[in-house]
């Protein structure tokens, strides 16, 4: 453990300090140094870790891959996740807390990105995962090579129809969604159509993409519990209107890169828990703030 309670990845030792001018230039890009020092398998992975706030330089988080770093700097990488990205740890909490089984199921990952959610699903027993992302080239190499994973990149989830994703194959009956720069309210109708009953889904609700700009503070962080609740409530109501039942709500064990508290919302056609009203959601948001800040 580091002095601030962080756990660090070990490759022979827990910290790395290279100060030999014959080996390194006076300064190098941080993403290059991570790869050179064998802290990452690729420069692309290094960039993802840096942007996610997982890399410390001289005990300070640096989140820009192109930052020029002195050759003598101490570079630390927080302990590697059991998944290809730490997003998997977020989903793992929901699966455990809500006692959701995905064993043998065909799943949809809306917003696959690196593939943390997909990796979590596979490690939890999923038979197949269809991953969709508007981007390209982000999915971890191990998942690209996994025959259980079908990847559809450069695709906007909002406009995707079942035939274009599954062809003649059966639809997924369990989904996970983690999207950015768009409200979940806009993609939920497509998610409903892309799943077959019982249409179970776990949504990662990111308040900064659900509220108006006036509610978003510095660095894109939604701090007020009232605003966080105001982000969750419309997503839940939209889901209920589409035909989903409420299963549960919890907060993510990890904050977003800028420090946003994120929430995990479980829905399903067979879920029959009473849906929380705004006050109950607000209470959850306040509890999350207290838990994370303690």
What residues fall within each predicted segment?
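Flexible, glycine-/basic-rich loop-and-beta segments that form/coincide
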Residues: 261, 265-294
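Class I SAM-dependent methyltransferase "Motif I" SAM/SAH-binding loop
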Residues: 111-113, 134
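A basic, amphipathic helix-loop patch mediating RNA/tRNA/ribosome contacts
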Residues: 24-73, 106-107
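S-adenosyl-L-methionine
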Residues: 136-170, 174, 179-182
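A short glycine-rich, Lys/Arg-flanked "PGG" loop and its adjoining helix->strand segment in the class I
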Residues: 185-199
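Short beta-strand element of Class I
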Residues: 127-130
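Conserved SAM-binding loop of SAM-dependent methyltransferases across substrates and taxa
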Residues: 114-125
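Short, glycine-/aromatic-enriched active-site segment of Class I SAM-dependent methyltransferases
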Residues: 207-224
